């Protein structure tokens, strides 16, 4: 990794001074372009997402057997979209800026199995790997009833193999729980930020948890090294995995169907804004890609990061991507938003998506705690701190009339806009832990 000359870089990119000072910033992306121009840089397209969607449909009968809580949705892991008008009124007052469109919450926080957005990509990649192994061994065909995977024969077969992953928490939970249920031996390398209850839950499901005193990057690197030593070990690489990315991307067509069912129109006169908390970038990157395929140029996706961990904003803004970490600027990467505590962004996601993202913003830990408390009070919905990162987004957009004008977004269009805040986790947080979160909120 070449040496970073911070003073030269801050001269070239003055916004970095605010990042270094840990000031909340908003940056609207001048590289953003149309779907047609941006998609070729991703290296994936709609057919890849359709393939992922078909694979999840094949596994749905198996998931019904393995996780009875998925039976109501026929083995399809999907979350509700809820209107949150009381929160909208509260925040219009708090921020002194009026968001005039409709405010909705995407409750990935309450997805079955692992209670976070990571149930999309993490579970999908484990299923894709299991399918590949079973087909290669002549035990499975795509036309089979996948319920046969929920048998001792298959558990014994998968028991010959292991899976490893590095995680700040939620990805590890999704991959650990899914891998163990299939019969794999699974090791989750957890960074210092990982919550204790997540480690306990993983161990209860039969996963091996290895703890590190360092951050996410170290946990991933150690997981990668362990997998290299064992030919039967598959490493799920959150920084570079196209399979994970596609698992998240399936969300786009699902949201489109939900909107159709809700009678919500998205077109040039009814824009859609989606606000996604961002850690290393795989989850929000994949979801944003799926949304762009579903809604084209009528959806504007923004990534939200903690002031202490603005890795994707830093990578895309400077064009250095994974060649720079927040620590290179003296930023500590210590945040209460454990799922977002990442110092170096995914180079794959940054390069793939930099032309398809409308903007980025940062907010403080205290702001996330305050939003957590306000949402619990206004709407009786309880989330973990990182899931609130997206909640400030509509007001960042509303405050920037210059950017709106550059996109042809006038007041009439903004009144008809839909703002979708992606709640990434928190549905499985233990009550005692949630009380601590709520106590950290300033009223």
UniProtKB/Swiss-Prot annotation:
In the UniProt record, does the keyword Lyase occur?
A: yes
Native source organism of the sequence: Aeromonas hydrophila subsp. hydrophila (strain ATCC 7966 / DSM 30187 / BCRC 13018 / CCUG 14551 / JCM 1027 / KCTC 2358 / NCIMB 9240 / NCTC 8049)
Q: Which PROSITE patterns match?
A: DEHYDRATASE_SER_THR (PS00165)
Q: Which residue positions does N6-(pyridoxal phosphate)lysine occur at? A: 118
Q: Which family does it belong to?
A: Belongs to the serine/threonine dehydratase family. DsdA subfamily.
* Cofactor field: pyridoxal 5'-phosphate
User: What biological-process GO terms show up in the record?
Assistant: D-serine catabolic process; isoleucine biosynthetic process
Q: What is its EC number?
A: 4.3.1.18
Q: Name one Pfam family in it.
A: PALP
Q: Reaction catalysed by this chain?
A: D-serine = pyruvate + NH4(+)
Enzyme class (EC, first level): lyase
Give yes or no: UniProt keyword rRNA-binding.
Answer: no
Keywords noted in UniProt: Lyase, Pyridoxal phosphate
Q: Which HAMAP family match?
A: D_Ser_dehydrat
- GO function terms (MF aspect): D-serine ammonia-lyase activity; hydro-lyase activity; pyridoxal phosphate binding
Protein name in UniProt? Probable D-serine dehydratase
Instruction: Provide the disulphide bond pattern.
Output: none
Q: Which gene encodes it?
A: dsdA
């Amino acid at each position: 990794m070449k040496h970073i000359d911070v003073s030269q870089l801050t001269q070239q990119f003055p916004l970095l001074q605010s990042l270094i000072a840990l000031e909340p910033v908003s940056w609207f992306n001048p590289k953003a372009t149309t779907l047609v121009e941006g998609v070729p840089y991703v290296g994936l397209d709609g057919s890849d997402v359709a393939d992922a969607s078909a694979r999840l449909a094949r596994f749905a009968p198996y998931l019904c057997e393995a996780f009875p809580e998925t039976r109501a949705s026929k083995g399809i892991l999907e979350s509700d979209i809820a209107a949150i008008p009381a929160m909208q009124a509260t925040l219009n007052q708090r921020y002194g800026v009026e968001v005039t469109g409709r405010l909705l919450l995407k409750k990935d926080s309450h997805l079955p199995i692992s209670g976070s957005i990571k149930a999309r990509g993490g579970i999908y990649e484990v299923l894709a790997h299991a399918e590949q192994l079973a087909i290669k061994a002549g035990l499975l065909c795509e036309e089979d009833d996948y319920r046969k995977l929920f048998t001792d024969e298959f558990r014994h077969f998968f028991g010959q193999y292991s899976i490893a992953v590095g995680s700040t928490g939620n990805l590890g939970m999704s991959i650990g729980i899914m891998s163990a249920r299939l019969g794999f031996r699974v090791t989750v390398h957890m960074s210092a930020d990982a919550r204790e209850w997540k480690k306990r839950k993983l161990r209860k499901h039969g996963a091996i948890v290895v703890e590190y005193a360092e951050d996410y990057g170290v946990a991933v690197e150690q997981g990668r090294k362990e997998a290299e030593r064992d030919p039967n070990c598959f490493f799920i690489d959150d920084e570079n995995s196209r399979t994970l990315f596609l698992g998240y991307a399936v969300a786009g067509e699902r949201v489109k169907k939900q909107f159709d069912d809700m009678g919500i129109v998205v077109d040039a006169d009814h824009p859609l804004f989606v606000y996604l908390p961002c850690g290393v970038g795989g989850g929000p990157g994949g979801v944003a890609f799926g949304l762009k395929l579903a809604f084209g140029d009528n959806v504007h996706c923004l990534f939200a990061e903690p002031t202490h961990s603005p890795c994707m904003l830093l990578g895309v803004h400077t064009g250095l991507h994974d060649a720079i970490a927040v620590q290179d600027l003296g930023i500590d990467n210590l945040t209460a938003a454990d799922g977002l505590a990442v110092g170096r962004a995914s180079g794959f996601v940054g390069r793939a998506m930099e032309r398809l993202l409308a903007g980025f913003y940062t907010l403080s830990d205290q702001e996330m705690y305050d939003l957590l408390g306000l949402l619990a009070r206004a709407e009786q919905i309880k989330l973990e701190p990182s899931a609130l990162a997206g909640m400030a987004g509509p007001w960042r957009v509303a405050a920037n009339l210059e950017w709106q004008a550059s996109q042809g977004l006038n007041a009439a269009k903004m009144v008809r806009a839909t703002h979708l805040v992606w709640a990434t986790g928190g549905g499985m947080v233990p009550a005692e832990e949630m009380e601590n979160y709520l106590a950290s909120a300033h009223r």
